[in-house]
Design a protein with these regions (language model features):
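C-terminal nucleotide
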Residues: 111-243
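Short coil/turn connectors at secondary-structure junctions
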Residues: 26-29, 89-90, 97-98, 121-124, ...
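Short, hydrophobic/aliphatic alpha-helical segments
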Residues: 25-37, 72-81, 181-192
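ATP-binding N-lobe of GHMP and related small-molecule kinases
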Residues: 1-41, 220, 232-243
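Short glycine/serine- and small hydrophobic-enriched flexible loop segments
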Residues: 15-19, 52-60, 154, 170
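Alpha/beta catalytic cores of group-transfer enzymes, especially the acyltransferase/condensing modules
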Residues: 68-113
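DPxDG-like acidic metal-binding loop motif
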Residues: 43-67
Length: 243
């Protein structure tokens, strides 16, 4: 079954990895992707799709996989599909569970979480959509920004999640020669945003602010002429929200 939104044939890879793990597939089933998350902009749509598909198979076949097992299958599926270099374990955790996590992708998901914490829901989140990724990702350029990435890690270790996000985004912008992203992020932070950063490897940008600053930040973002999505942090488990 072809799913037009599945550009990397990720769902085929999910089925292959699921079967290779010795898990049963339903006799008759099909896929449909229902999502407002744009693809190819650093918003982790591949991790979300793979986790959702594996959770759906888990429910349909009464397999009883836990979160860590679902994450491991998601990582393997994304690698098999070729839509990630690292396996995107961090992104898979973000897709399936609330809060934030610092993970070691070299470890199985069960042992991968190094630090984790919660983010309160009383913030506004904006996503600036700047089209699909056009720049090639050069791993050496990312290595050149090691000092800034280390600053991000230090902030996270000290509990400064938003500072960590901004520093990480600054490093990614420098590594991808994205001067526009740096200008946008610096501008919204100067106008009161708590954080502004490229998401993933870009080019989308996330902005976090207090709810009382929402109108001002919206006005600043409107000047960019890009499409803006408003979102929020969710500390509730997805299953609880569905109920």
């Amino acid at each position: 079954q072809d799913v037009k939104e599945d550009l990397h044939s990720l769902l085929d890879s999910v089925e292959i990895i699921w079967s290779e793990a010795g898990l049963p597939l339903p006799d008759n089933f099909g896929w449909q992707i229902v999502s407002n998350v744009p693809m190819g902009q650093g918003l982790k749509s591949s991790s979300a799709i793979s986790c959702a598909a594996i959770k759906a198979l888990n429910i349909a076949t009464w397999t009883g996989l836990n979160e860590s097992e679902i994450i491991d299958l998601s990582v393997s599926s994304q690698r098999h599909a070729g839509c990630t270099v690292t396996g995107s374990m961090d992104d898979s955790w973000a897709s399936i569970s609330p809060g934030w996590k610092l993970v070691d992708p070299s470890q199985p998901a069960k042992y991968s979480i190094l630090i984790e914490g919660e983010i309160k829901e009383d913030y506004c989140v904006f996503i600036i959509l700047r089209g699909t990724r056009s720049n090639e990702i050069n791993s050496q350029k990312f290595n050149d920004q090691l000092t800034i990435f280390e600053r991000s890690l230090s902030s996270l270790s000290n509990g400064s999640v938003f500072h960590a996000m901004s520093a990480n985004g600054m490093a990614v912008a420098a590594a991808t020669d994205d001067d526009e992203a740096l200008r946008i992020c610096n501008n919204v932070i100067a106008n009161g945003a708590l954080s502004a950063a490229i998401t993933g490897s870009g080019p989308a940008i996330s902005v976090v602010c207090f709810k009382q600053d929402k109108a001002l930040i919206e006005e600043v973002l409107s000047r960019t002429q890009y499409e803006i999505i408003e979102s929020s942090f969710q500390e509730s488990d997805l299953a609880e929200m569905i109920k």
